[in-house]
Amino acid sequence: EEACVREVAEGRPVEIGRLQRFATDTMMAKEGHPYGRAEKTGKRVAVVGAGPAGLACAHRLAMHGHEVLVFDARQRPGGLNEYGIASYKTVDGFAQAEVEWLLGIGGIKLEQGTRLSGGLDLDALIKDHDAVFLGIGLAGVNALRIEGVDLQGVDDAVEFIADLRQAEDLSDLAIGRNVVVVGGGMTAIDAAVQSRLLGAETVTIVYRRGRDRMSASRYEQDLATSKGVRIISHARPVRVIGNGAVREVEFEYTRDGAGGLEGTGETFRLAADQVFKAIGQTLEGAPDALRFEGGKIKVDESGRTSVPGVWAGGDCASGGDDLTVTAVAEGRDAAEDIHNAILVGQEEVNESSRPGNEPG
């Protein structure tokens, strides 16, 4: 919406998100499924990860008549939509309603509580299926390597958001009086705003670069400040202070130097009885047989990995922009390529075109 020309001409963009939500809700409210399923092909595809990319891939493959088995590490499908969107941004049950609607096409089975390297073996999946799609997301969290991060009250923001989404009563969740959030992305904004809504007296987001470098949109930043969240830029954490539990966080002001970000030597402290780390997520549990790029699974434009018969998409794959809509598109496009490969006979790919096997 920020790129909409009406934002400049009229000061308000076309509200694409709300239009899509209305269209989706209207379609899901109707009886029956709008997409027909093709005649069964007898082909079986394994999808690992029941997030936006995995579910989009499974749905498109089912449309083509293939049997799809979806594995997911968590007890409820939905991925980011179920565990990663703050409670104040959504309504209860929407993610599960979408999953049920997707499964309505038929031909898709879910198996919960199973993850790669923890019960699932990639070689076995390849052997037992005609193709494998990996949509495992980013399950790891970047480490904050400073003194005091092991103190009570220092938590991962992604786990906080997940706990909120699964809680039956938000009032049962303990929240600090003075909350500090380290990071500059959407998760940082969500943790900060949700903390204010749950009753925190002061909430401060601290980001190491300027606000123009925050990955959270300006709209999200303004939303946070409108809720009483303070944003401090050009500062990085030095240490967490406390005796068993966090009491303060010490920060150092930063500046952009010739060699990159550098500290100025000037420090300050913020009172805190709860600190949320929101400094990014990492790939976790991906098989070593795959090739990687920038900390993600390396794929080509069709989602093919370096391992024959294995595709990947969504946040776990290289080249994306970490948006849900992009993950859905990558899952859908990979499904089309999988369909062609296993049914039309295009599974033989020139090794020189595979990621990581370029000549020279």
Where are the predicted features?
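Iron-sulfur cluster-binding cysteine motifs and their immediate structural context
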Residues: E1-A23, L69, A73-R76, G107-I108
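A conserved FAD-binding loop/helix module that cradles the flavin
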Residues: A191, C316-G345
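Feature captures the FAD/FMN-dependent oxidoreductase FAD-binding
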Residues: E39-K40, R44-V48, Q96-E147, R239-E250, ...
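Residue-level detector of alpha-helix initiation sites
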Residues: G51-P52, R76, G185-T187, A317
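Glycine-rich dinucleotide-binding loop and its adjacent helix/turn
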Residues: A23-E39, E100-G113, G118, V141-L198, ...
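Rossmann-like dinucleotide-binding cores of NAD(P)H-dependent redox enzymes
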Residues: E67-V70, R74-G104, I108-Q112, A192-R239, ...
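N-terminal Rossmann-like FAD-binding beta1-loop-alpha1 element of flavoenzymes
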Residues: K43-L69, T187-R196
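FAD-site-proximal beta/loop scaffold in flavoenzymes
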Residues: D150-G176, G259-D322, D337
